[in-house]
Amino acid sequence: MATREQLADEAARARKVRHLVDLSTSLIQQSGMTRRDAEHLVQMVRERILNLFPDGEETYELVYAPRFRRLIDEFARPDAGVLLQFPGPRR
C-alpha cells in the first residue's frame, strides 16, 4: 500500500503533467508556431512527462499523442518550403 508521501508525490507529478500539457496546447493553438516548432515542443513535453512517470509511455501514446497530433494538424503553420532555383533557358 502506498504511503501518504508517495500519494502526495504522485499527485504533485500529475499536476506538473497537467500544467505542461495545458501550457503546450495553448502555445500550439495561439502562437502561430510552425509545424516543426510544435513537434519539437511536443517532443520536449513527452520527454518531461516520461521523466516524471517513467512507466507512462503507453499512457502518453494513448492519451496525449493523439491530442497533440490533432492540435498540430489544426493549428501549426506549415514549414517554409525550400525554393530551388533552376538555371534560366539556354541561349
Which sequence ranges carry the predicted segments?
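Surface-exposed peri-terminal alpha-helical interaction modules
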Residues: 1-91
